[in-house]
């Protein structure tokens, strides 16, 4: 008998069949407990902003410039310069961002971890990160991987003759994969069947040549895109494991017009308009090449599936030398310009100079080459100076020529290279900084001074702030105004709960609750909101007019203060005296500083804390609650105590009684938990969709309460019930109020990066 067969240990800790295997639809609370001190080796007292400010920024940039042209035998640089590879690394780090939920992006250095480190679209970026490890190692804690990846892309552009718009640091690393991001439901790499449902598959075109005259295509419906492809929200990539689109065309079908539709949708979901999209593609493809030297079956497993001896590398390549001229990355073998390590306008020049015909790369991927052998010898080889090539293009490149809107922009950039340079610089900065949040988080000497609308600008506070005496007087005015506790609390919640920890957007600062589009969202009950805001604005005007030293209170501060006053009054109604912490310093943005379309993405499709759902969704209401809680950076206990408190404060949209398990609304008691856990009642569904319920007295049959799925999950889900039992116990009232005030204050201050 072998030694192995005698061993009684078949599995290590954490192995075996999991709860998720048994109950795949079980509510996942693990996403509320990511990135704790238990996984962070830096320690709880680590201050990344302080460390970054002590960094010799120019020295880091010089070290990166040195890396650019110091080719390594283990991964030789194309054309003797790593710049294009590093641009791709930074682009793919930032390009996972999507507007729908603000998740993805470069802000946490997630490219180091699964699944991103093993996505098919990120082949060879394991090598890029390893090339800059000596720089990271040298500066250690003073610069995060997240910042270094983006900075390396910037330095790469500059080292190849491009003037960037700027760079800001301030992206602290995390130390584990983000489990909250929904990347899709497909179970195979490059699958797209789930995100597009059962929609019509793309059909191969009958002709693989595009002629030079764009008017022949301008009004032609793509033969490969009859019918709209509706991409699942909040996804912003067409296939599992891609950043944006399939460069060969939709589902690998080489149709540039159909490709343009995918490009417009995916780049749009990353907050890019048509001009920014063209600039990013034309600017990015001014550099470097793609890699498809041989058949894809030569490529080994991705990093997460590779052997220990690979030490984090993946995609080992057995074709030829497996590197240099034998590299296989995307399977496409395309070089766009004759100066792939120097900024130029040649990408657009070549795009419009030739008639293009379909061909295949050595790996068998669809790509395009000039007709009739045109352009032969124009393009240098990346590793062999004795070889020359014709220019080549991707299907997604030709989209810029044969989509009418993209073509118009591309031709303008072709005629005006300085416009492309400016547009690319701005779009690149937006791409790499979109998820950083407000300017208060931006660090470093290259932070641009220009105010950009997509940054959700907020004016600087230039006046004296209210003091404790003013705060007490203002709270008195608010409580005497005739507004109810529920109105005060719901208004403050409406303002603050737009915050997204993913891209640091939203929150109460800026006072945008009074502006379009937020003032008109159904979830904010516009008629009630207008009344509350009118009352608060009168209090604000009266206070500000009475000051002789320039002291002011903003409406943003007053909204939060009103909520605090409401919470304090509700606690007083329950017999407890509390003071809700309040820190003034918020400012009021203008409508001109507010991009209505951009802010529309912050409108909640569901807010379980207000028992609101905009429509019916495949995702359960309780899952949407957890999603909202995660964006608010709440833990499971914080989510639980917050919801239980808001229910008894009666802030449900439309004054719905679902979940208001108390006969003393606007009183901060633990009644929600006591009555939910009451065994004297029995719950039954009252709708065929199992989304509303009623509790009847077991003896009399009398209806005592009604509730939603969001309410009942706190008694149904074992972990949430355990937490609810803490707050539903006989001795829990004081602890409940204390914890509620703490998490309420946390939410009100989520966007106060100026306090850090």
Swiss-Prot record:
One of its GO terms (cellular component) is cytosol. GO terms for biological process: cellular response to hydrogen peroxide; hydrogen peroxide catabolic process. It catalyses: H2O2 + AH2 = A + 2 H2O; 2 H2O2 = O2 + 2 H2O. Residues 214-223 have a biased composition (Basic and acidic residues). It comes from the Bacteria. InterPro entries: Catalase_peroxidase, Haem_peroxidase, Haem_peroxidase_sf, Peroxidases_AS, Peroxidases_heam-ligand_BS. SUPFAM superfamilies: Heme-dependent peroxidases. PROSITE patterns: PEROXIDASE_1, PEROXIDASE_2, PEROXIDASE_4. There is a cross-link at residues 244-270 (Tryptophyl-tyrosyl-methioninium (Tyr-Met) (with W-91)). Binds 1 heme b (iron(II)-protoporphyrin IX) group per dimer. Heme b binds at residue 285. One of its GO terms (molecular function) is metal ion binding. Formation of the three residue Trp-Tyr-Met cross-link is important for the catalase, but not the peroxidase activity of the enzyme. Bifunctional enzyme with both catalase and broad-spectrum peroxidase activity. This is Catalase-peroxidase. The gene is katG.
């Amino acid at each position: 008998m072998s030694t192995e067969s005698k061993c009684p240990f078949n599995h290590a800790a954490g192995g075996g069949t999991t709860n998720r295997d048994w109950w795949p639809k079980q509510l996942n609370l693990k996403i509320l407990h990511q990135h704790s001190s238990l996984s962070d080796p830096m320690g709880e007292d680590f201050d990344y902003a302080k460390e970054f400010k002590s960094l010799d920024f120019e020295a880091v940039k010089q070290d990166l410039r040195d890396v650019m042209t110091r080719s390594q035998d283990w991964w030789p640089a194309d054309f003797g310069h790593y710049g294009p590879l590093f641009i791709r690394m930074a682009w793919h780090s930032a390009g996972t961002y999507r507007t729908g939920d603000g998740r993805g992006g470069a802000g946490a250095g997630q490219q180091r971890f699964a699944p991103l480190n093993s996505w098919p679209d990120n082949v060879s970026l394991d090598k890029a990160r390893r090339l800059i490890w000596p720089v990271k190692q040298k500066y250690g804690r003073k610069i995060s991987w997240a910042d270094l990846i983006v900075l390396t892309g910037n330095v790469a552009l500059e080292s190849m003759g491009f003037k960037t718009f700027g760079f800001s640091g301030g992206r602290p690393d995390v130390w584990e994969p983000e489990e909250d991001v929904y990347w899709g439901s497909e179970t195979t790499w490059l699958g797209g069947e789930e995100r597009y449902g059962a929609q019509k598959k793309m059909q191969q075109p009958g002709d693989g040549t595009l002629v030079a005259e764009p008017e022949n295509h301008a009004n032609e419906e793509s033969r490969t895109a009859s019918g709209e492809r509706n991409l699942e929200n909040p996804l912003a990539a067409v296939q599992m494991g891609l950043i944006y689109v399939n460069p060969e065309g939709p589902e690998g079908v080489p149709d540039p017009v159909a490709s343009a539709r995918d490009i417009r949708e995916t780049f749009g979901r990353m907050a890019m308009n048509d001009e920014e999209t063209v600039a990013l593609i034309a600017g990015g493809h001014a550099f470097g090449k793609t890699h498809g030297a041989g058949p894809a079956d030569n490529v080994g497993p991705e990093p997460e599936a590779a052997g220990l001896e690979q030490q984090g590398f993946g995609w080992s390549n057995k074709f030829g030398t497996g590197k240099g001229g034998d590299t296989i990355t995307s399977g496409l073998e395309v070089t766009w310009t004759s100066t792939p390590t120097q900024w130029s306008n040649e990408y657009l020049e070549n795009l419009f100079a030739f008639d293009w015909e379909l061909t295949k790369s050595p790996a068998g991927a669809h790509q395009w080459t000039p007709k009739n052998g045109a352009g032969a010898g124009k393009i240098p080889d990346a590793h062999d100076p004795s070889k020359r090539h014709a220019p080549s293009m991707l299907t997604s490149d030709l989209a810029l020529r044969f989509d009418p809107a993209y073509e118009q922009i591309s031709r303008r950039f072709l005629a005006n290279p300085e416009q492309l340079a400016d547009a690319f610089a701005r779009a690149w900065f937006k791409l790499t900084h979109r998820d950083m949040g407000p300017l208060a988080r931006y660090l470093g000497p290259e932070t641009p001074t220009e105010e950009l609308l997509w940054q959700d600008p907020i004016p600087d506070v230039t006046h004296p702030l209210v003091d404790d005496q003013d705060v007490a007087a203002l709270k008195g005015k608010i409580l005497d105004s005739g507004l109810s506790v529920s109105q005060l609390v719901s208004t403050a919640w409406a303002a603050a709960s737009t915050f997204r920890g993913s891209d640091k957007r939203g929150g109460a600062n800026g006072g945008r609750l009074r502006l379009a589009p937020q003032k008109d969202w159904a979830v904010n009950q516009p008629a009630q909101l207008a009344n509350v805001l009118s009352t608060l604005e009168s209090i604000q005007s009266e206070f500000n007019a009475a000051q002789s030293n320039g002291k002011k209170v903003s409406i943003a501060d007053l909204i939060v203060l009103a909520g605090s006053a409401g919470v304090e009054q509700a606690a007083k109604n329950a017999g407890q005296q509390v003071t809700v912490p309040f820190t003034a310093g918020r400012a009021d943005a203008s409508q001109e500083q507010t991009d209505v379309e951009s802010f529309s993405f912050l409108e909640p499709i569901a807010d379980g804390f207000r028992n609101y759902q905009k429509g019916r969704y495949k995702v359960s209401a309780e899952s949407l609650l957890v999603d909202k809680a995660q964006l608010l950076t709440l833990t499971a206990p914080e989510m639980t105590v917050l919801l239980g408190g808001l229910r008894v404060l009666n802030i449900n949209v439309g004054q719905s009684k679902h979940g208001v398990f108390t006969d003393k609304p606007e009183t901060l008691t633990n009644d929600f938990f006591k009555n939910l856990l009451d065994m004297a009642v029995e719950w039954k569904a009252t709708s065929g969709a199992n989304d509303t319920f009623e509790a009847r007295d077991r003896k009399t049959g009398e209806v005592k309460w009604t509730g939603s799925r969001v309410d009942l999950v706190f008694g149904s889900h074992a972990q949430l019930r355990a937490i609810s039992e803490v707050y539903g116990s006989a001795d829990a009232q004081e602890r409940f109020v204390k914890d509620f005030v703490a998490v309420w204050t946390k939410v009100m201050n989520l966007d106060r990066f100026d306090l850090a």
